[in-house]
Structures are given as structure tokens and as C-alpha cells.
Amino acid sequence: MNDQVIIFDTTLRDGEQALSASLTVKEKLQIAYALERLGVDVIEAGFPVSSPGDFESVQTIARNIKNSRVCALSRAVEKDIDAAAEALKVAEAFRIHTFISTSTIHVQDKLRRSYDDVVEMGVRAVKHARKYTDDVEFSCEDAGRTPIDNLCRMVEAAINAGARTINIPDTVGYTVPSEFGGIIQTLFNRVPNIDKAIISVHCHDDLGMSVANSIAAVQAGARQVEGTINGIGERAGNCSLEEIAMIIKTRQELLGVRTGINHEEIHRTSKLVSQLCNMPIQANKAIVGANAFSHSSGIHQDGMLKNKNTYEIMTPESIGLKNQALNLTSRSGRAAVKSHMDAMGYKEDEYNLDALYQDFLKLADRKGQVFDYDLEALMHFSNLREEDDYYKLNYLSVQSGSVMATTSIKLLCGDEEKCEAAVGNGPVDALYQCIYRLTGYDIVLDKFDLTAKGEGEDGLGQADIIANYKGRKYHGTGISTDIVEASGQALLHVINSIHRADEIAEMKQKKIATV
């Protein structure tokens, strides 16, 4: 049996479903580039029929990603499959992933069909997808709770119809490893044409079993594992791909399989997904948590000093977590900044060096020494900004005491600079009152978070907000050594996104009116 395990990432599809606010096309493309660097075999970029935004995201990713196969999801419905193919056709090669529910509860209560109808729908969907590509994946939704006879029948029929990958999801995270591995083993034993397809698994983490179930499936013969970076996803999340990759690498002698993952990209990819998705990583998270390589016990520290292997089964360097290099200061030139970015593995086309250097100089003037983690934070924030931002903060002054705070700002609105001052319950409240008055947007703030992005009193602070405007949620981010300024940047990030969305909607209306 082939010893290569295909890694199928669904961060941009299943993972995004867990987010408070949808990612922009630009943010999704950033993540797709990171997944490509990581060595992911298949990137599930979205569900094109679900919305124009998802269609555009899939199309953009399919156009730009060259070293990973781009995939789109569709129900077992012809219009879904047509939309997926239309979005993907800009790629040299692509995959269509179609699915239908197979468990008794789903068939009877959700689909309200007979099982014969479900099999026929699945077969029809696979055949229709094959008109567009030979690379068709078929999923039996809720396979973990599907009667085994029905599951075997569906798998055999889908393979006969032309599916080259059969995905067995534990959709509600119900099974345990021995049980799930047994399902995969039974398929290999009972489905006569099983050798004509790759068996894939897609496990959810409702009972904390997703990674263990996936490894059990690999031991039983599955050769594709689906999951997400940091395990993000519906409800309790998905199988964590960085954990799968490091388990296979660390226990290769036991498992006898391998992946094509570039393990030294794990840490960087994890941080990027956490940053853009506004989902902090728990400190004790396996592989990528802040405490993953920490040793506080005296006994453990003694052992580590004598021989690292006493308590360390893998190294921080193996996932790309490197020691801090020499610090940068305001006297450091562009070449020094570029050298640090090169050392961290970033390519020139992943960031704008001129913009990053200007942000670096401002930060260096404020805090003196700038560290690699500061540069990364500045780069991520710089990449989020748009060149055509309509609203820009030109000046900020805060007076705060024991009673009320006063904030004065100058805001560039297009080509016009406007001034405003306000009193509020704290400097951030006063600043937000100023911005609301000058922009005129009626925004409801759902969530406000402040996070330290560096170390020490002069470290960078990141503000993240979730805002609601006309029923749609927006995520805004700001970063600065001044948390009030960071908070203002976050709100302006949201307002600029709303402004762009309004402009696009207005242009569409004008086009419709002229037809």
C-alpha cells in the first residue's frame, strides 16, 4: 500500500464556518499562499454556490495557487457542481468535492428520501462532476453514524460512477478510534472496487477524538486526512493538521507513512491563521501552543539540561520556531529588515518592503529595539491595509484623567481632512465617538479584544473588533504600541471595509439600471 498520506486542508471552507466574521478575499489568499508553502496537497478554498464572495475567493485562489491542488465543495446538486467548476476553471488542474448525507437520521429527517434515492443522487453528482475533471471526491456525510451495509453500498456506487477519492467523515465527532478505524478496515474488506479510490477521512472534535480517529484510520489504510490549521471549525473544531503532520513525522517507524509537509512552516502558518481568523491559540495546544516547548518543573528542567531528549520528543526548530535573532533599531536599514524577513522564511512577494520599512521606523522610534515578532505583526497588519482606504487617521490626541476622557482627531476622508473632539467613558470610547461622527456609520460593536503581540511595556498591542452593520458582521484589526491608536485603526479597518462594500453595491446597481 502507498505510504504517502495526502494532506487536505479545509481551513478556508470548514474552518471559516466557525468565525465571527467572514474572511476577505485578500485574507483567504494570504492563508492559501501559507498553505502552499506548508506543502498541503489539496486546498479546499470554499463553497462557490453559497455566495458571490465565496465564488470570488475560490476563483482567486484557483488562479494564484500553483503547487497545491485547489478544490471546491458542492452538494450533490448539479447547480452546485456547475458553480464549483466555473470558479475553478482558471486553474490548470482542480478537484470538485461533492457530498450527500448517508446516516439514517440524515436520510430520513433531513433529506426525507429513501436510501435508494440517496445512492442515485450521489452517483448522478459524481458523474456530472466528472464532466469537468477526473479529480472528483465524494463524501458520505455523517458516515460515522451510517449503517455499515449502507456505507459500503454508497462507497462502491460512487467509485463505479468515477469518484477517485472517497471521504469518510465523522461529521459530529461521535466515534472512538477503535470504532472509526474498524469502519475503514471494513470498507477495505467489503467494497470490491476499493482499490480504485483513495480513502479519505474528515473527523470533527466534539468528543476530542478527531486526531486520534484520523490516525486510527491511517493505520487501517486511509491515505488522505482532512483537517484545518489549529483545528478550527464547526462547533468544537476539526482535526488539527499540524498535529497530524507531526505525529506522522515523530512516529514514522510505528505508522510507516509520510506526508509532503514542510514542517518548518508549521509555526508560521499557525500564527497567520490565528491572526487573520481572530482566534487565539490556547497556551497548552499541542505543537503550536505557547507552552508546547516549555518546562517549568525542576525535575524536567534538570533532565533537559542533561539531555533534551529526556522530556522533548521534537524540537521547537522542527516546526520553525527559532530563537530571536539580533534586534533591529531605528538605525537599521532596509537591507537589515529584509535580512530578518528572509531569515524568517518570508519571500519578497509576500509583503511590501517599502511599506513595512516605514512602519518599522515608526515603531523603532517609539520602542527602540524591534524584534522579529514585531516585524511579523507589522507585516500582517500592513497586508490587511488597502492602498485605497478612504478613511485614514492623521492625528490623535488623548487627555485622560480620573473622571472622563477627551480625544481629538484629524481624519482624512478621501481628499478632505476633518477634525473632531469628543468626551467619553475612557479614551477609546471618546475616540470612537469622534470616528462615528465624522464617518456617519451606524455600527454596533459586538466584540472588542486587546492582545499583547510582543514582550515588555513597550510591546505592540493588537486590537480586534467584531462589528455589525446592516446585519453583516465585519472584523477589524489595529496594531500599535499605543492601544488607543490600535483601537482606532481597528474601527477604521471595519469602516473602510463597509465603505468598499457600499461602493461595490452601488456600482452593481448602476450596471443593472443601464441594462
Swiss-Prot record:
InterPro entries: 2-IPM_HCS-like, 2-isopropylmalate_synth_dimer, AIPM/Hcit_synth_CS, Aldolase_TIM, LeuA/HCS_post-cat, LeuA_allosteric_dom_sf, LeuA_bact_synth, PYR_CT. Residues 392-515 are annotated as: Regulatory domain. It comes from the Bacteria. One of its GO terms (molecular function) is 2-isopropylmalate synthase activity. Its cofactor is Mn(2+). It comes from Vibrio vulnificus (strain YJ016). The keyword Ion transport does not apply. Its EC number is 2.3.3.13. It is an enzyme of class 2 (transferase). Pathway: Amino-acid biosynthesis; L-leucine biosynthesis; L-leucine from 3-methyl-2-oxobutanoate: step 1/4. Mn(2+) binds at residues 14, 202, 204, 238. Keywords: Amino-acid biosynthesis, Branched-chain amino acid biosynthesis, Cytoplasm, Leucine biosynthesis, Manganese, Metal-binding, Transferase. Catalyzes the condensation of the acetyl group of acetyl-CoA with 3-methyl-2-oxobutanoate (2-ketoisovalerate) to form 3-carboxy-3-hydroxy-4-methylpentanoate (2-isopropylmalate). This is 2-isopropylmalate synthase. Homodimer. Its main location: cytoplasm. CDD domains: DRE_TIM_IPMS (cd07940). It is found in: Cytoplasm. It catalyses: 3-methyl-2-oxobutanoate + acetyl-CoA + H2O = (2S)-2-isopropylmalate + CoA + H(+). Belongs to the alpha-IPM synthase/homocitrate synthase family. LeuA type 1 subfamily. The lineage of its organism: Bacteria, Pseudomonadati, Pseudomonadota, Gammaproteobacteria, Vibrionales. The gene is leuA. Residues 5-267 form the Pyruvate carboxyltransferase domain. GO terms for cellular component: cytosol. GO terms for biological process: L-leucine biosynthetic process.
